[in-house]
């Protein structure tokens, strides 16, 4: 089964989680920081570091997990798909919040000033929140299913 068929086999909530992970990854090309003067911006890729790498790895791992779920594979117990996706969403959100406080420095003529936040970092935060919310919803469905059995 190809990855496109695997995505087609996902439930609506699992697709919502995939959308959140894709938003987190795609937001790296949007402006995350803007200079205090001149309208200059810095994207997530423009200020790439270990935190941004962790953000992309987390989003990629969530998408890889969802593709495996679409192919009919589940993680071994005690791991649950919903819990793993929620953890990925909270972790990605934590990374974005860290990057909100760890802004690059803008230097001009010997003066240093922090970049201001731009819209891309909030898009990434929204994607992380969507991933976490979908993971919690999936986990709730899993728990209800476990109680019935």
Q: Predicted regions: what is each one?
A:
Residues 1-149:
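Compact integral membrane and secretory-pathway proteins
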């Amino acid at each position: 089964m190809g990855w496109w068929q695997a995505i087609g086999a996902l439930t609506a909530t699992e697709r919502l989680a995939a959308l959140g992970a894709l938003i987190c990854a795609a937001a790296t090309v949007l402006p995350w920081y803007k200079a205090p003067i001149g309208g200059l911006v810095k994207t997530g890729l423009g200020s790439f570091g270990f935190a941004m790498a962790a953000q992309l790895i987390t989003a990629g791992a969530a998408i890889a997990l969802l593709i495996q779920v679409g192919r009919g594979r589940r993680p071994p117990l005690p791991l649950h798909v919903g819990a793993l996706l929620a953890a990925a969403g909270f972790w990605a959100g934590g990374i974005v919040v860290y990057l909100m406080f760890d802004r690059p420095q803008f230097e001009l003529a010997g003066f240093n000033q922090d970049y201001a936040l731009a819209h891309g970092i909030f898009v990434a935060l929204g994607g992380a929140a969507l991933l976490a919310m979908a993971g919690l919803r999936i986990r709730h469905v899993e728990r209800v299913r476990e109680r019935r059995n």
